[in-house]
Design a protein with these regions (language model features):
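Outer-membrane beta-barrel initiation region
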Residues: 1-88, 125
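Residues that define the transmembrane beta-barrel architecture of outer-membrane proteins
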Residues: 10, 39-43, 68-72, 111-115, ...
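Membrane-embedded beta-strands of outer-membrane beta-barrel proteins
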Residues: 14, 45, 74-76, 117, ...
């Protein structure tokens, strides 16, 4: 669907095109969205087989590869009732090896797998408004080792049950816009199987609850539909200190873009983005953006909690920059350059600012290119 000028002044129309999905579809992508630990440059492939058995089911295969990691996902879903109930099952596997020795001379190696069941049901389905509810159960397993000695650094399982609501709404306010939102609550259990790190997990209770939320608004600013403003927020709250696999992160191409992937991890946090976009000739879109986020590392602090970052328990990151996107006939290429706003709150024992990837890059650039077929 897309927004376009209405028949009368001040009106916005929503164009919805209903088409039968192709039997097979896919996407290939190259980007630098990965972690420096396992290789920033990534290759991505996504393949979908639609209506596999003739009942509206879908089989999906996704993969991501970098210099030091390989990730794969297999998912299947099918309609379970005439009124929109859909059931699904998915599994993932990832292995990694630390290809950069900035964090530790011994590096790290490990793997992880997940398995999950899902159910989704539409509460509201209309041209202007949609509201869906979801129920998911996931099992996650992680193993991390010292690459030199093969000693287990950490091994643990997580069981999660989550309930969620998500939706969108199209309206004609101020020239037309699209609003989206989602909320979810997760009830989880952490089972630490083994570790060689002293005190690992001592301040991370096994049972936890967390609440996650997100929302966005894409608002037209001009009558010609060429200029828009985009606002997005997201975050999470938690009952106790969380394991790193369940934490909230601020940095990266989908967060505060002036900072690297996995920067600013915490049990609780919030993130906001403001972006002004202008469509240009030849299918280009220019944007200017501002990102800001706050993270609380621990719900409950303990002796020695600061570790190597020497930051306050609660701190903020900010950044601003420019982006350019080109879309044409299945091709999608975009890039962004972001500068830090304010000082970096993370520093080492010598008082030097440092990021989680061992660099102090400023500005920081992100680029991705994909083709959909």
């Amino acid at each position: 669907s897309q927004l376009e000028p209405g028949k009368s002044d001040g009106e916005t129309a929503v164009r919805v095109q209903l088409t039968e999905p192709p039997v097979a579809a896919g996407r290939v992508e190259l980007n630098n969205y990965g972690s420096r630990t396992t290789g920033a440059n990534q290759g991505v492939i996504a393949l979908n087989a639609n209506n596999v058995t003739g009942i509206g089911d879908q089989l999906a295969l996704n993969g991501i590869g970098s210099e030091g990691s390989q990730y794969g996902q297999l998912a299947y879903s099918l309609p379970a009732s005439p009124n929109g109930l859909r059931l699904g099952a998915a599994g993932t596997y990832m292995n990694y090896k630390n290809v950069s020795n900035y964090a530790s001379p011994n590096g790290g190696v490990g793997d992880a797998w997940t398995a999950g069941l899902s159910a989704a049901y539409p509460l509201i389905r209309s041209q202007a408004t949609n509201l869906n509810t979801t129920l998911n159960y996931d099992i996650k397993s992680y193993m991390n080792k010292n690459n030199t000695t093969q000693t287990v650094i950490s091994s643990y399982n997580i069981n999660n049950l989550s309930l969620g609501l998500s939706g969108n709404h199209y309206d004609g306010f101020g020239g037309g816009g699209i609003s989206t939102g989602s909320v979810s609550v997760v009830f989880g259990y952490l089972d630490i199987l083994g570790t060689s790190a002293p005190g690992y997990g001592a301040y991370t209770p096994p049972s936890f609850t967390k609440f996650a939320f997100s929302g966005s608004r894409n608002q037209q600013l001009t009558e010609d539909g060429l200029t828009s403003i985009y606002l997005a927020i997201s975050g999470q709250l938690a009952s106790v200190n969380l394991n790193s696999a369940e934490q909230f992160y601020l940095g990266g191409p989908y967060g505060v873009r002036a900072y690297p992937v996995a920067q600013a991890a915490g049990t609780q946090g919030g993130l906001a983005t403001l972006e002004v976009r202008r469509q240009l000739p030849q299918n280009f879109t220019l944007s200017a953006f501002f990102d800001a986020g706050t993270v609380q590392q621990y719900k409950n602090t303990y002796q020695g909690w600061q570790g190597l970052t020497h930051a306050n328990n609660t701190y903020s990151l900010m950044g601003a920059g420019l982006g350019l996107k080109w879309i044409y006939d299945g091709w999608n290429v975009s890039g962004a350059v972001a500068w830090r706003v304010g000082s970096n709150p993370l520093y080492n024992q010598y008082g030097q600012a440092v990021n989680t990837d061992g660099t102090n890059t400023n500005p920081r650039g992100w680029i991705t290119g994909s083709y959909t077929f």
